[in-house]
């Protein structure tokens, strides 16, 4: 099995990258892909850049050049579920765009034209992630992760997301684009991220302060998840 791992920022990939054995680097169109083995698993780790376009382009390059069997999206997210605190884990059941609106043509809010309303994460990967959470004794919430090209900082944008997606557990800027690409390629995916902020008026300050905490937690999750996947 080969696992593709995608993080947007340097801080979100550096801990994993530094542990890759026999590491080689491939740079294409501003995307950096690191290949080798991690915990005995063949991996291709992508630093995509921030936002939906960067994530979609990077995921496509990763799938075309490295042919991973599964995709794991890692990194940080803003918490929406009331029980989530900084460092907690979110696992996707599904992902949706929170900033897509073609409702004039009969689509659901958040649904891109010609696409499903949601992109479903793989059940086997979800189960492996939940097993990993139990093993590490982490607090986690499983559910809908929503994505858009905005860092959510303030009550107006937050209220809009809560109104349109009351079931959403977390918000970030890449996961749905990655799920969209994986859907088109027929490659299973899951989002496993750690909370860096709670998407409120002070979220930009919390993000800057706690990004390292989120990166450490999400990287630990991915490492342990790879071990679980390698066991089959």
Swiss-Prot record:
Keyword Cell membrane: no
Active site: 12 (proton acceptor), 197 (proton donor)
GO molecular function: adenosylhomocysteine nucleosidase activity; methylthioadenosine nucleosidase activity
Pfam family, one: PNP_UDP_1
Catalytic activity line of the entry: S-adenosyl-L-homocysteine + H2O = S-(5-deoxy-D-ribos-5-yl)-L-homocysteine + adenine; S-methyl-5'-thioadenosine + H2O = 5-(methylsulfanyl)-D-ribose + adenine; 5'-deoxyadenosine + H2O = 5-deoxy-D-ribose + adenine
GO cellular component, one term: cytosol
Pathway: Amino-acid biosynthesis; L-methionine biosynthesis via salvage pathway; S-methyl-5-thio-alpha-D-ribose 1-phosphate from S-methyl-5'-thioadenosine (hydrolase route): step 1/2
Entry keyword Glycoprotein: no
EC class (word): hydrolase
Enzyme Commission (EC) number: 3.2.2.9
GO biological process terms on file: L-methionine salvage from methylthioadenosine; L-methionine salvage from S-adenosylmethionine; purine deoxyribonucleoside catabolic process
InterPro entries, sorted: MTA_SAH_Nsdase, Nucleoside_phosphorylase_d, Nucleoside_phosphorylase_sf
Keywords: Amino-acid biosynthesis, Hydrolase, Methionine biosynthesis
Domain of life: Bacteria
CDD domains: MTAN (cd09008)
Record-listed substrate binding positions: 78, 152, 173-174
Family affiliation: Belongs to the PNP/UDP phosphorylase family. MtnN subfamily.
Subunit structure: Homodimer.
Its biological purpose: Catalyzes the irreversible cleavage of the glycosidic bond in both 5'-methylthioadenosine (MTA) and S-adenosylhomocysteine (SAH/AdoHcy) to adenine and the corresponding thioribose, 5'-methylthioribose and S-ribosylhomocysteine, respectively. Also cleaves 5'-deoxyadenosine, a toxic by-product of radical S-adenosylmethionine (SAM) enzymes, into 5-deoxyribose and adenine. Thus, is required for in vivo function of the radical SAM enzymes biotin synthase and lipoic acid synthase, that are inhibited by 5'-deoxyadenosine accumulation.
Protein's UniProt name: 5'-methylthioadenosine/S-adenosylhomocysteine nucleosidase
Gene that specifies this protein: mtnN
């Amino acid at each position: 099995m080969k696992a593709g791992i995608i993080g947007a920022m340097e801080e979100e990939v550096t801990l994993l990258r530094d542990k890759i054995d026999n590491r080689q680097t491939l740079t294409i169109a501003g995307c950096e892909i690191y290949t080798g083995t991690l915990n005995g698993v063949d991996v291709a780790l992508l630093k995509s850049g921030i936002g939906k376009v960067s994530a979609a382009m990077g995921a496509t390059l990763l799938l075309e050049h490295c042919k991973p069997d599964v995709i794991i999206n890692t990194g940080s997210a803003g918490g929406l579920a009331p029980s989530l605190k900084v460092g907690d884990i979110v696992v996707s059941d599904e992902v949706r765009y929170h900033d897509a609106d073609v409702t004039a043509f009969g689509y659901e809010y958040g649904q891109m034209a010609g696409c499903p309303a949601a992109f479903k994460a793989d059940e086997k990967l979800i189960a492996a992630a939940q097993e990993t959470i139990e093993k590490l004794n982490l607090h986690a919430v499983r559910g809908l992760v929503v994505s858009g090209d905005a860092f959510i900082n303030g009550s107006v944008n937050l209220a809009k997301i809560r109104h349109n997606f009351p079931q959403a557990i977390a918000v970030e800027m890449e996961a749905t684009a990655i799920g969209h690409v994986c859907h088109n390629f027929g490659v299973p995916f899951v989002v496993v991220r750690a909370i860096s902020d709670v998407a409120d008026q002070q979220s930009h300050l919390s993000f800057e302060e706690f990004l390292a905490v989120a990166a450490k937690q999400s990287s630990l999750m991915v490492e342990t998840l790879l071990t679980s996947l390698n066991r089959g």
